Amino acid sequence: MPKHLEVYKCTHCGNIVEVLHGGGAELVCCGEPMKHMVEGSTDGAMEKHVPVIEKVDGGYLIKVGSVPHPMEEKHWIEWIELLADGRSYTKFLKPGDAPEAFFAIDASKVTAREYCNLHGHWKAEN
């Protein structure tokens, strides 16, 4: 059963969904169950995928990887998400953008998640 804020991907068409309200049935796309994208469960290099959380004046700066992640046409970060105080904040990226996002929020505990088009879903907590 899908749970709140889990991310799922269709292995056929590539549709990706984030669960806003978990119901009682599995998610299906193209006639088959969608794959749950578990954070950090692929073979991507950790130093290029695990979000780095930095508390800065006015909010949080999230950088993807301790070594900057490529942002090329065939390999890029699709989005960066910050979870804090029961809220979700998302910045969508495209090839050529910097693999980082600033979120102007005041929270003491946050979780940062990102999605790489080749290596899936990754997260870090402060």
UniProtKB/Swiss-Prot annotation:
Extra remark: Catalysis occurs at center II. Fe(2+) ion of center II is the electron donor and is converted to the Fe(3+) form during the reaction.
Entry binding sites for Fe cation 1: C10, C13, C29, C30
Assembly description: Homodimer.
Protein name: Desulfoferrodoxin
Gene Ontology BP annotations: removal of superoxide radicals
Cofactors demanded by this protein: Fe(3+); Cu(2+)
UniProt keyword RNA-binding present: no
Record key words, sorted: Detoxification, Electron transport, Iron, Metal-binding, Oxidoreductase, Transport
GO molecular-function term, one example from the UniProt record: superoxide reductase activity
Family that this chain belongs to: Belongs to the desulfoferrodoxin family.
Cofactor note: Binds 1 Fe(3+) ion per subunit. The iron ion 1 is coordinated via 4 cysteine residues. Binds 1 Fe(2+) ion per subunit. The iron ion 2 is coordinated via four histidines and one cysteine residue.
Entry keyword Transport: yes
EC category: oxidoreductase
Free-text note on domains in this protein's UniProt record: Is organized in two protein domains. The N-terminal domain has a fold similar to that of desulforedoxin and contains a mononuclear Fe(3+) ion, center I. The second domain contains a different mononuclear iron center, center II, with a Fe(2+) ion.
Superkingdom of source: Bacteria
NCBIfam families xrefs: desulf_FeS4, dfx_rbo, neela_ferrous
Alphabetical list of InterPro entries matching this protein: Desulfoferrodoxin_Fe-bd_dom, Desulfoferrodoxin_Fe-bd_dom_sf, Desulfoferrodoxin_N, Desulfoferrodoxin_N_sf, Desulfoferrodoxin_rbo, Desulfoferrodoxin_SOR
Listed EC numbers: 1.15.1.2
